Amino acid sequence: MKRKIIHVDMDAFFASIEQQDNPEYRGKPVIVGGLSGRGVVSTCSYEARKYGIHSAMPMYMAKKLCPQGIFLPVRRKRYEEVSEQIFRILYDITPFVEPVSIDEAYLDVTHVDKNPEDIALEIKKRVKDATGLTVSVGISYNKFLAKLASDWNKPDGLMVITEDMVPEILKPLPVTKVHGIGEKSAEKLRSIGIETVEDLLKLPQENLIELFGKTGVEIYNRIRGIDERPVETMREIKSIGKEKTLEKDTKNKELLIQHLKEFSEIVSEELIKERLYCRTVTVKIKTADFAVHTKSKTVDKYIRFSEDIYEVAKGILEEWKLEQYVRLIGLSVSNLSPVKYEQLSFLDKRLVKVIKAGNLAEEINKRIGKKIIKKGSELLKDNK
């Protein structure tokens, strides 16, 4: 039986919420993101996109392109509230929902006794009625094609890609439209004269494997309409991280290390909450020329406390020869494994106390409606 996969993608989500909440912004270029000189665009309205503005663009550049635009800070809590409304609608249709981000998801409706197009129209109507927002929906028999379809007629689009349309419908597309081909891979392909999917279809599988390794097989299949990836209702957490764009470029390692200490606490809290260990710690920097560099270290035993993560991250940065000024610093952990209490050593029993204390603090704060119980590091930050 051919699967029936739906890809749901909200249109300019953050900016659309701002326009919905503030009617005076409707029809005007709205740009949401970090408002400092070093901030970047999170998203922008379709009116702003006409000026060449796009996500991840430095905010100062967006202001140059559209000085008359409405520039707004990110209201994460508000966007999460709206996202919850939307996902409640999706889960009401099927339990087989894979959240991709705050504003994007896949649904497997193979066993829903309803035409996929009717389901798509229902989603669009219910989201519009509940939030006032538009959503683009793609329908196909696998995830790659469903996502491609949702992007076809944005905003407020609805597109179906059937088996008999492939590969013809894909041929004119740039190679960057193929899942698994980013800008760097596209550059590699352009260097050998391959710019479109039609060009790519002419390459034998062996050549794609030479270029991309195992991913070459997946790319070979996808451009022929084959993608066996399931809709994952419980997505595996592969990494946890935190990063920050600095107010001012710096080479000051002490300042950067202080940020890593703060990030270690945030990452540790998330590991404990998810009941996970990690073995690999990665430090990321973005230099003044926007080049991204990462260095990782894998330790012998699984760790999860902030002091352990911090020591590894600090060691990585101390050995790093910084030749350029740094504009962004980040920390992430990976190589994760579930916590198993029965395997904890005597010293590790502190984890149980931390989890219990953390959960109790969360519950009290939740019931009171305020964050009255804080960590020592939070109190120090508040007093600065």
UniProtKB/Swiss-Prot annotation:
Pfam families: IMS, IMS_C, IMS_HHH_1. Mg(2+) binds at residues 9-10, 103. The catalytic core consists of residues from subdomains of the finger (11-75), palm (77-161), thumb (163-224) and little finger (240-335). Residues 5-182 form the UmuC domain. It comes from the Bacteria. Changing residue 180 to V: 20-fold lower dsDNA-binding compared to wild-type. Changing residue 290 to A: Significantly decreased dsDNA-binding compared to wild-type. Bypasses 8-oxo-dG oxidative damage of the DNA template at 37 degrees Celsius, but partial loss of the bypass ability at 70 degrees Celsius. It comes from Caldanaerobacter subterraneus subsp. tengcongensis (strain DSM 15242 / JCM 11007 / NBRC 100824 / MB4) (Thermoanaerobacter tengcongensis). Changing residue 13 to A: Increased primer extension activity compared to wild-type. Increased formation of incorrect base pairs with the DNA template at 37 degrees Celsius. The lineage of its organism: Bacteria, Bacillati, Bacillota, Clostridia, Thermoanaerobacterales. Changing residue 241 to E: 20-fold lower dsDNA-binding compared to wild-type. Belongs to the DNA polymerase type-Y family. This is DNA polymerase IV. Its cofactor is Mg(2+). Changing residue 46 to A: Decreased primer extension activity compared to wild-type. Forms correct, but not incorrect base pairs with the DNA template at 37 degrees Celsius. The active site is at 104. Changing residue 154 to A: Significantly decreased primer extension activity compared to wild-type. Forms correct, but not incorrect base pairs with the DNA template at 37 degrees Celsius.
